[in-house]
């Protein structure tokens, strides 16, 4: 059961206060996310930000009894589809502000990392979506219709903050079902992100890292899985000034040791194994182009006949420290799960334009960042699932509160018209019932006036 909130907590105000504290309105203006007339871009953005906690999509909300709290559907979709908005810059500005605050809460020597990974955003039933492509899903081991969401995040071991993303289509034209719309002005931010969506995955990954560093986001290492841990990638990240820790596959790549080239399994014979531990040992070698790396051999609990190999370009780290730091990579997997399960990543809007998908993804990333901000500021040990449902329940409880108070007021009004004997009997029963309820229900009826 999710923990009950105290009587004075107001989730909407709490979320809105975080938005104000982070100066979201200023960040939107800096990223050219503005409107020339009508309701402000800040109000539209804040509505879309909180929409997921209402338990309804945009269509259902605009057809509900609370539709007076919203503006027209066209206003929201024009906002999502605008090609002039620089969502990439907005997310970088927000993440830089949040990571700076988180860094101030920890000691300077604490390791901070950038985590790189991808996840497929499916559009299985779509046909006319802009830049829709045939992409490979490494989880289900088959091709899907949709996009590869390449994501870069920041972590200090306690918090995870999404820094940037690229909704990759496909670098191969033969794998793309749709191309860039002819109506897009080539001078806009929208056209630029469309061109970036057709970059190869390694090129897009390096671009994300360089942008994060240019925005002032500080990190000591980049963590990657087996797909990204390649020699060209290591070289590019070293040029950018960052060391890498990643897992490597047992392929045909060779590493130089004592003047000879060996594969990963062949290097095992040079390591003194300690079978009683999970970390068997390590060895320092060089890659084909001369990059010195440290390879740590770790027990594979899923398949005891094989080992796992962790590679670090920082050879000064101990074996245990390399394994510990690499464990922070799990935070991005939790982020993907939370974003898709709770924050409706990829399912909240089914628009056909690439701009709408980018703006929606940025809104989801912003939701996650603000939830993390609230959790960190309050030193809250809740999981993201608990925090999400706490927000939803509080909004629903406010509606229930109003309903109960209105019902009781109507009851008291009709009650006053009855005879004195019946009134005394009913008043006694109602008072007895109220006293048997929980304290938060009793508090709703403290100010009831029984006199006509």
Indicate where each model-derived feature is located.
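Electropositive, glycine- and tryptophan-enriched low-complexity nucleic-acid-binding patches
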Residues: 57, 74-81, 139-218, 295-309
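Short, positively charged, Gly/Tyr-enriched micro-motifs
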Residues: 27-100, 108-109, 155-161, 198, ...
């Amino acid at each position: 059961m999710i923990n009950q909130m105290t009587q004075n907590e107001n989730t909407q105000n709490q979320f809105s206060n975080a938005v104000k504290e982070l100066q979201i309105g200023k960040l939107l203006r800096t990223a050219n996310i503005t409107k020339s007339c009508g309701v402000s871009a800040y109000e539209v953005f804040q509505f879309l930000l909180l929409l997921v906690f209402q338990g309804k999509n945009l269509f259902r909300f605009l057809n509900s009894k609370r539709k007076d709290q919203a503006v027209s559907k066209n206003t929201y979709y024009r906002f999502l589809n605008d090609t002039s908005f620089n969502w990439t810059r907005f997310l970088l500005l927000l993440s830089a502000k949040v990571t700076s605050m988180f860094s101030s809460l920890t000691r300077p020597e604490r390791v901070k990392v950038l985590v790189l990974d991808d996840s497929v955003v499916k559009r299985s039933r779509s046909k006319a979506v802009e830049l829709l492509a045939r992409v490979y899903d490494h989880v289900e081991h088959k091709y899907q219709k949709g996009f590869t969401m390449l994501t870069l995040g920041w972590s200090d071991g306690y918090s995870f903050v999404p820094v940037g993303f690229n909704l990759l289509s496909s670098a191969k034209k033969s794998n793309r079902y749709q191309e860039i719309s002819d109506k897009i002005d080539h001078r806009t931010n929208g056209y630029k992100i469309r061109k970036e969506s057709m970059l190869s995955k390694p090129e897009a990954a390096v671009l994300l890292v360089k942008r994060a560093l240019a925005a002032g986001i500080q990190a000591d290492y980049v963590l990657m899985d087996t797909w990204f841990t390649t020699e060209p990638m290591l070289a590019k990240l070293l040029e950018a000034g960052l060391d890498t820790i990643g897992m490597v596959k047992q392929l045909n790549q060779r590493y130089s040791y004592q003047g000879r080239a060996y594969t990963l399994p062949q290097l095992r014979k040079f390591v003194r194994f300690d079978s009683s531990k999970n970390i068997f040992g390590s060895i320092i070698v060089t890659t084909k182009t001369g990059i010195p790396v440290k390879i740590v051999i770790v027990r594979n609990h899923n398949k005891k006949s094989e080992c796992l190999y962790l590679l670090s370009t920082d050879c000064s780290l101990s074996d245990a420290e390399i394994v510990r730091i690499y464990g922070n990579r799990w935070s991005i997997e939790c982020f993907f799960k939370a974003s898709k399960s709770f924050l409706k990543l990829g399912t909240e809007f089914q628009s056909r334009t690439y701009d709408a998908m980018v703006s929606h993804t940025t809104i989801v990333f912003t939701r996650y960042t603000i939830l993390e901000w609230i959790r960190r500021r309050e030193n809250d040990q809740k999981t993201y699932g608990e925090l999400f449902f706490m927000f939803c329940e509080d909004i629903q409880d406010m509606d229930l509160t109003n309903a109960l108070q209105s019902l009781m007021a109507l009851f008291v009004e009709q009650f006053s018209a009855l005879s004195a004997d019946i009134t005394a009997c009913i008043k006694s029963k109602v008072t007895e019932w109220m006293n048997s309820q929980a304290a938060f229900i009793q508090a709703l009826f403290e100010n009831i006036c029984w006199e006509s």
